[in-house]
């Protein structure tokens, strides 16, 4: 359409038909000076000399095309050398030049410069540039179409190969699954046996430790060392009191001995020790006291008080007497305090004691074999999942509607950005649109791919992206993308015409229409 417009512009200079002021060339036949004038709406017929007499006779204002008499009239600007234009008749002779040829101000006293020629020149240059963009864009579009044809064939070939290889890989995965399960069975049995043996050993060690504690307690309780613990001997430990009165009565002691008056070592361990274990306190004082911690030499030393002078002999004797009295008082206090509970000897490292020992050589061999089988199975399973994903992606891309000839296919794996004063807008065609603050922050979805929404005659001129992030107390964000012809691919503008509804323009060669044949130049003429 651009080149025909270029051809029409110079033709305007050659056409000049006599007609009343303000009448267009297409309507001049309605204004015949030799006949009465009939209003264009048929509302009246008047003598022709009443046309443009500055009095409105027709309801549609058609009798006053060149004056401002009718409020609903229209004045036609011829604008020779540029584009014709209709203006409301109330702008005629209003002192403002609306027509580039100045014909609307013929009787206002205003002198209008005729700018039509210059405007026509600029218009032709603009149209020529647009025509050049269209030609170059369409040339690139044909390349895009050919590229997609080749790429589509390659993708279809790749899809067939993947679909054929999928069955083989599925069989391999199932085979490796069987191998894995077979390798895991002896591994599981060997690990369970190792666990069981370790737990048995741990239980035996704890039982041995408990028996040693009971033996020590029995030895302490057997004051007369006759090989038995009697009620009287048990009563020497009031902490075993069962009724809370602070003393162990004979009846309570006999109850702890299961009704007997005495018990030997075997019965003591089997029946008595469990009942008194938690309350029993050893008569022996702990001998291994923790050594005082060494001073931290790295810490700054506090200011020390002055060292006192050496004491005299009399002072030393007094200090020794005071220390002896203090020791006697401490011994009396210790005798009154309850003895510490009998506790098992602590291992050097409890974590080491509870830690299961390493597997034996045969068990470790089963574990290594099972792990190798698992690794091979998991690797094959990952390969199968990757292949299935590749198949899905190829099927989706091959079947996607990329335009009449696939010219928009090259946009499928691309993203384009436009930075404004506040935001960075990102368009990934056929996938999503988003925005994020220019100074940093999380992106906000402006919609995901919906469909082509151009008019019926130009379906592929607009895209719709829907179901973006919801607005506060509003709808989900959505974006319409208009596709414009251009030699390059770029987002040229983004606006928000309505709340949460965005409009984006994408320039692309794929949107360029086929241009008409180029008009012959002045030198390219045929001889008659």
Swiss-Prot record:
Biased composition (Low complexity): 247-258
Cell compartment(s), UniProt: Endoplasmic reticulum
GO-annotated cellular components: endoplasmic reticulum; endoplasmic reticulum lumen; glucosidase II complex; intracellular membrane-bounded organelle
Annotated Ca(2+) 1 binding sites: 50, 53, 55, 57, 63-64
Domain LDL-receptor class A per the UniProt entry, residue ranges: 37-71, 72-113
Signal peptide interval: 1-14
Residues annotated with Phosphoserine modification: 24, 89, 168, 383, 390, 434
Assembly with partners or alone: Heterodimer of a catalytic alpha subunit (GANAB) and a beta subunit (PRKCSH). Binds glycosylated PTPRC.
Protein name: Glucosidase 2 subunit beta
The species this protein was found in: Homo sapiens (Human)
Organismal lineage: Eukaryota, Metazoa, Chordata, Craniata, Vertebrata
Gene assigned in the entry: PRKCSH
